[in-house]
Structures are given as C-alpha cells and as structure tokens.
C-alpha cells in the first residue's frame, strides 16, 4: 500500500527522533556521536558486528585548512592557496599537468553556485609563477558543453595566463578513456560506472574549484563532490538521453547515492587529487545546488586534504557534520581528516565567519540514510539462530 504524505513524515520524524536529530531548517553544528552498542545489549544481527567502530581506518594525521575572509573574491582564493603553499608544492612538482575542475556546466548559465571568473583567476594567479603548464581548465556535462567557457566568462580569464598553456575541455565526453568503478544501484545490485580519464590519470594534479552551497540530495556540496560528480562519463556525442549518462548511476536513492560517491572518492583521491578550493564569497542556501538563494559570506577555503576543507566548510555553514553521508563514509575509510580537533585552521577563525545556512526543503528525506532500512530481508546464514530441526535424514 502506498504511503500517505502524513505517514511518510511521521516515519521520518520517528527516525529523526530515534537518532536525536533536529529537523527545523536550522540545526546544531556539533557532530553526532558514533552509534555504539553497550556491552551485553541486544542488537539486530542484521546490523553487523557491534564493534565495527574500532576497525574504521580514521585518518590519524593533522591536516591544515586555510580560511580567508575579505572583500575581494580573487584575492581570497589566491591568499587561501598561498597560505598552504608549503603543502602544495611537493605534490605539484611530481605531476605533468594540472586540471582545474570548475563547477557550472549544468547550472543553465546561472552564476550563483558556479565557479566565478574571479575565482578561476585567483587559482591561476597562484599557479602562474609555480607551474609551467600545461593547465587544463573545464567542467563536465551530460552533453556537449563547450559553450560554458563563454557562458560563464571563463574564456575572458585565459588571455592573461599564456605561460600556463591553458586549454578548456569538457572532461567526461571522451568515451575511449575511462576508469571503471563498481557501485550499487537502488536494489543493491552491482553496477559498472565509467569515470572520465582525467580523473584517474596519475600524471594529473586535480584542483577542485568548488562553491559553498546546499544540496538537494547530500545536504551540502563543496570540494569532494565537485570532483566525484564531475567524473562520470556523459552520453556519447549526439546522444542527449540523460538515462545513458553514467552520472545517473549516482542518483539511485539516498543510500546507494551516498555510498557510490564515497566509492568514487576512494578510487580517485589517492591517484591525483591535489587541492580542494572552496569559494564562499557568495554561498548558496535553501534549495541548492541550482535553485537556492545567495549568502554574502565573503570567505575562501583551501586544503590538500579534501575531506578537511569540506569539514571546515560545513562548520562555516552551520551544518551538522554527521549529516552528509558520503563525507562520513570517506572519514571512516581514512580518506582524510574530519575531526575538527585535528584540523589546523589558518587565517580567519571559524567562529568569526560562521553563518547558519538555510537547508534544502527535503533535508529530512536526505537524512534517512542514517536510519534503519525498513525493508531488510529475513535473516539467513550464520547470523540466524539455529532451528531445532531433525536433519538426520539428510546426513
């Protein structure tokens, strides 16, 4: 029987109450404590081992995130990168080319929520005296998107950086070069997902030019998601059917979607992720990532630890860090530092710049990944209690 709207929200509220969540548009900022099981307490064996917490490979090193506040977007970005220059240079020297992943092709020409020309200029200002090129600049799309370079004004920036041998490209249109990821669909069946070649090329140094904004599926999006969701291959040229896009395989339900994003980050990050840059000069709140409203925040963040820069970004937005599933999975797998106590923030203090971002109207649904799956199958196998049956006839 189909659930009514009233029953749906009643169930969502019950899940939220059980987890101690606050779903009132504004939320607390402290991360929720990990779910643990008290010694001797009964728990559903379908939930797996009760001592899983101690086996997660949490990142044990300190990370550095620059947080700059100022009235010039370009300078904010540049200063954020200079502040972590000592961490960038060693990795940058080892790579053959840089790829700056912008954010904007799918924003239908709306500058809010997209990588601004001044943000790109700030990144190139930093690179110009430190890297001789080539530098590829671009975004991904679900079809031909070269018009984006002029649509968003990125092409006007290129003329000032001829030494970098700049080239714009749509990164996920090349059907002949890709990396293969095995994710899961809505029914938890394994599915192959093709990721664009640039995103799995060990010769590349990837810079994520993300934007501080809320999201309609994963609560918030910044540096990590900009690369993860830029990687899936688009349909072949001439095919405008979104169903044939690899990106669709990440939009397969709130649980599978978060998990597939984590899997993609786990595959790509060790290969070539260089710097996570987040432009928060004008953030987006409400129904992001494309239909939200502006927040005059006037900040920029950067780090070589993508998880850490997103963690600080969440704090600046006043969002509970335990809410984005893909980031929490990445932390549990040791992909970066997510513990604020182990992140050194240089520049402005978080408390000085923090704002409360209004979240997407569907945030209560997004948080259902945290609750129990209500359609779990019957217990089978080793976790099931042995039945008192006479099986001697089968011996």
Model-derived features with residue positions:
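N-terminal and secondary-structure boundary signal
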Residues: 2-395
């Amino acid at each position: 029987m189909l659930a009514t709207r009233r029953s749906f929200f009643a169930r969502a509220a019950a899940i939220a109450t059980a987890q101690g969540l606050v779903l009132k548009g504004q939320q607390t900022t402290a991360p929720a404590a990990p779910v643990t099981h008290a010694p001797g307490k009964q728990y559903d064996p379908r939930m797996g081992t009760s001592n899983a917490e101690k086996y997660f490979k949490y990142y044990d090193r300190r990370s550095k995130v620059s947080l700059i506040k100022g009235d010039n977007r370009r300078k904010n970005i540049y200063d954020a990168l200079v502040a972590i220059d000592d961490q960038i240079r060693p990795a940058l020297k080892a790579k053959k080319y840089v790829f700056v992943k912008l954010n904007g092709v799918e924003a239908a020409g709306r500058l809010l929520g997209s990588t601004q020309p001044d943000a790109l200029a700030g990144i190139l200002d930093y690179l110009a005296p430190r890297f001789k090129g080539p530098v590829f600049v671009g975004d991904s799309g679900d079809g031909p998107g070269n018009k984006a370079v002029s649509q968003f004004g990125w092409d006007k920036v290129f003329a000032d950086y001829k030494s970098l041998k700049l080239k714009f490209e749509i990164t996920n249109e090349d059907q002949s070069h890709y990396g293969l990821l095995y994710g899961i669909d809505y029914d938890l069946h394994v599915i192959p997902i093709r990721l664009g070649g640039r995103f799995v090329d060990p010769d590349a140094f990837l810079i994520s030019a993300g934007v501080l904004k809320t999201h309609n599926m994963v609560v918030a999006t910044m540096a990590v998601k900009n690369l993860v969701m830029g990687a899936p291959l688009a349909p072949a040229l001439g095919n405008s059917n979104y169903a044939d896009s690899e990106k669709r395989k990440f939009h397969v339900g709130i649980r599978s979607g978060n998990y597939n994003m984590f899997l993609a980050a786990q595959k790509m990050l060790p290969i070539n992720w260089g710097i996570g840059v987040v432009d928060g000069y004008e953030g987006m709140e409400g129904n992001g990532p494309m239909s939200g409203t502006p927040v005059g925040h006037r900040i920029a963040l950067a780090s070589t630890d993508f998880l850490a820069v997103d963690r600080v970004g969440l704090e600046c937005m006043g969002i509970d860090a335990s809410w984005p599933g893909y980031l929490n999975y990445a932390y549990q797998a040791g992909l970066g530092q997510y513990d604020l106590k182990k992140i050194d923030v240089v520049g402005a203090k978080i408390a000085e710049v923090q704002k409360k971002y209004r979240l997407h109207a569907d945030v209560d649904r997004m948080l259902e990944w945290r609750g129990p799956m209500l359609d779990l199958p019957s217990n089978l196998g080793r976790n099931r209690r042995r039945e008192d049956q006479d099986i001697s006839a089968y011996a």
